[in-house]
Amino acid sequence: VKRILIPVVCACILIACTPSEEVENEEQRVENETEPVETLTASKEDIRFVAGWLNETAILFVDHKDDEDRLLSFDLKTGDIHTLFTSTATISEVQVHPSASQLLVKTADDSTEAIIHILDHAGTLLNEVSIESSELEIQWNDIDASQLLITAFTDDWSYEIMRYDANDDTLVAVMLPDPFPSWLGAEELVYMEDLDVVKRLLSTGEKTTLANNANQFHSATDQVLIESFEGEQIRYAVLNAIGEEKYSWFVEDHSFVMEQAVFLDENTLMMTITDQTEMKPTSFLVKIQDGEEVKRQKLPEGGSLDCKGDKCLIGYSLDTWINIETGERVKWLEIEPLE
């Protein structure tokens, strides 16, 4: 009876049922509907790894077919698969630039050389550079896609750090005590020196200490998240590019440490935290907004994290995505068992 009377009342008393309310109700109805998602089924022998989000509806993965490695995109809404890049050499790494419509693909035939290919989203080659090592740590500048920071390791794990400029196709050596630096903004690097987090201006070599007694850090674009220990607590702080603290928070349980972190915007980040002291580690996906924990969801396992829009790919194989707000989990990749 109620459902019949409501539209009658709304029709008679227009002020009680405005067009804006109707729009809001329609938006809520759409939001509550589960969006259709296609599933990719692949052989364990063929698929090599999932690279992450290409955009909010498509995921990149690498497979092997007809003696070639292939970089493919899979559209979750349509199920369409597109080939973006193929190579007779092994594809071992793929990165998606956060602001430019570009992809980075690393290939190698053996341990003596690797080639870094820069492509657009259609798969067109834009640049490539050869490095005399296949063990590389590659940091792509989030602001300027023409700049790469490359650490090349040798067999004895000594290393050389180089800055690659795609504008003039040059490699310039960078001397640092840490083989795993990251970009902070367009022209600065951040790295660990003993227990200090240090930033350095590339043009002058000027150094600034950002934090002491640090455990680890994660930088993106022009901000850096630093994890440090203060007594029995873990302190997290987000700093801007000039070293000013934007916000911070404490975690009482120091057994949980940051495993992965992704900045969604200037004020929001997603973290996976894991209790490594347990025989079977417990992991959570945590949403932090302006230094406040606003959402915590238990994960079946730790592993990698890649977020785009309202979804995060999770797990060691990135075969599942989770809705950040609702906690809905969908396994988009099914691996067929070996016969």
Which residues make up each language-model segment?
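C-terminal motif of bacterial Sec signal peptides marking the signal peptidase cleavage site
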Residues: 13-16
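Bacterial signal peptide processing site
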Residues: 18-20
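Surface-exposed loop/turn elements that mediate protein-protein interactions on large endomembrane-trafficking
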Residues: 26-38, 67-83, 111-128, 156-174, ...
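Beta-strand-rich domains and repeat architectures in extracellular enzymes and scaffolds
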Residues: 37-72, 88-94
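Repeated scaffold domains used in trafficking and secretory/extracellular systems
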Residues: 45-52, 90-96, 134-141, 175-187, ...
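Beta-strand C-termini and the immediately following turn/loop, strongest in propeller blades
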Residues: 55, 60-66, 104-111, 149-155, ...
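Blade-loop segments of beta-propeller domains
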Residues: 82-107, 114, 125-134
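Asp-box/WD-like beta-propeller blade repeats and closely related beta-sheet repeat scaffolds
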Residues: 124-141, 145-147, 152, 177-178
